[in-house]
Amino acid sequence: MKAAIYMGKEDIEIREIPTPECGDDDVLIKNIYSSVCGTDVAVYLHGPNTGHRITTGGEFGHETVSRVAAIGKKVTDFTMGERVYPYPRFAKNDTKRAGTIGGFSEYILVPQAKRNHSLYPVPQVIPDRMACLIEPFTVGCRAARRGQPQAGESAVVFGAGT
């Protein structure tokens, strides 16, 4: 499969790497639409020491919508072809690499996949080009919740991301 590998400041390589194989507890997803995050731009321009969770040598990208392509023998809560959003913080079971889960790769292997934890179902009413923006949407929602608005109040979130 083809994958964008983050090598450091202004250095991304497109490589042919083996397609991951699904273990008993894993789910393999095929990316269908990805977007470029402000974090992607920041670490590309300024390097890995920007404070973002990025792994040099890791598969780049984290804003994506995907389809389930393979399911491990012990996994029962996903179906083949189901559209899913891989939650960057938990998709690889390594919170240090949330920005390098493989959004710009053909496939992502999600180890020990859990519904509504590492992978979230995406309703069909949301088009792919919008579904890949679930991650920045959740960031804005979290920011609004942290402001603890009360019923009837408004919350505005400003940002320069995607």
Stretch-by-stretch model annotation:
Residues P18-S34, P48-F90, P123-V125:
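Glycine-rich beta-strand-centered segment in the early N-terminal region that forms part
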Residues C37:
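Short cysteine clusters
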Residues Y87-F158:
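NAD(P)H dinucleotide-binding glycine-rich loop of Rossmann-like/cofactor-binding domains
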